Design a protein with these regions (language model features):
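Acidic, PIN/NYN-like endoribonuclease modules and their adjacent C-terminal/linker elements
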Residues: 2, 96, 108-144
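Structured helix-beta-strand junction loops
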Residues: 33-34, 75, 114, 132
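Short, conserved alpha-helical segments within structured domains
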Residues: 40-44, 64, 86-89, 107
């Protein structure tokens, strides 16, 4: 089963966030299912930004951010290069979801293109998708 994961969910694997335990349980479940994990290249930049923000907030030290980034780059998550097709689909999704920015829509468009599940730590995004009839989007809070 193909799965697209977003940066918010991934950051929970490194930083102490309210949904860190669920993120670990989800990753264990996906490994057991032998899921293929994917993310748009944007994912790396969003994770880097999250680590930097954690440094700025004093949650982690700069050296930890560097170590986390190295560990992140070693994860078995396929980075899917940008394409015109994905960008156009992301624009359509951003418009459909009423988003002012199209970052989240990149993950949605990729999941749609790969016929994959989308797992996110963004409850509002997932609820918005479900209200649009999308049954392949899941919030980390669904993990027990």
């Amino acid at each position: 089963m193909a799965v697209v994961i977003d940066a918010n969910l991934t950051l929970a694997l490194f930083l102490r966030l309210p949904y860190t335990e669920q993120a670990y349980r989800l990753m264990d479940h996906l490994r057991e299912r032998r899921s293929t994990l994917s993310a748009p290249v944007l994912w790396e930049y969003e994770c880097l930004s999250g680590f930097h923000r954690a440094v700025q907030l004093g949650a982690i030290r700069p050296q930890q951010a560097a170590e986390f980034m190295n560990d992140l780059l070693a994860l078995e998550i396929e980075r899917v290069d940008p394409s015109v097709e994905n960008h156009l689909a992301a624009l359509r999704w951003a418009e459909r979801l009423g988003q002012s920015k199209a970052y989240d829509a990149q993950y949605v468009a990729l999941a749609e293109r790969l016929s994959a599940e989308l797992w996110s730590a963004d409850e509002r995004l997932v609820n918005n998708l479900k209200s649009q009839g999308v049954d392949w989007a899941h919030w980390i809070g669904e993990v027990s």
